[in-house]
Amino acid sequence: MLRKMGEAVARVARKVNETVESGSDTLDLADCKLVSFPICIYKVLRNVSDQIHLITLANNELKSLTSKFMTTFNQLRELRLEGNYLFRLPNEVSSLQHLRAIDLSRNQFQDFPEQLTTLPALETINLEENEIVDVPVEKLAAMPALRVINLRLNPLSADVRVIAPPLIKFDMLMSPEDTRAPPP
């Protein structure tokens, strides 16, 4: 077990070093078995955090992200968090004013993360395969850049299915009503 942990730590260190040394705008920490974002990464990336435009933390074991993560990487254009255990986002997600795409699919959201509706550049939201019942349709309709929101495989209420289509100017992807039964 210790050997596997050591290998995981070494993999994270290698990926972070590659980002710093290459001057890449991408930090890919997918499939690293992370339960939280490593604090030491803030220090290592302090001189290049403004240059990072894409972070992938997909398929880890994250339950939350800190406000420090959001404010440190406030130049992000894309954030990939699919396949974790997230159920909410910190309020500081509103500092991601340049964010164009966020993937929160296959997490544990029961409530739509309404902070996303304050992001002026956000074009794509993927919340597929969560537990979301209700969606702030009016707030989404007011988002200037939004083009697609994926809500497939969520137990959406009938109200969302009926009210949303006439109000929105973007593509709202939903599963057929009988794909998943709502929770009891």
From Swiss-Prot:
LRR repeats: 23-44, 51-72, 75-96, 98-120, 121-141, 145-167
Modified residues (Phosphoserine): S175
InterPro entries: LRR_dom_sf, LRR_domain-containing
UniProtKB keywords: Leucine-rich repeat, Phosphoprotein, Repeat
Lineage top rank: taxon: Eukaryota
PANTHER family: PTHR48051, RAS SUPPRESSOR PROTEIN 1 (PTHR48051:SF1)
Protein name: Leucine-rich repeat-containing protein 20
Organism encoding this protein: Mus musculus
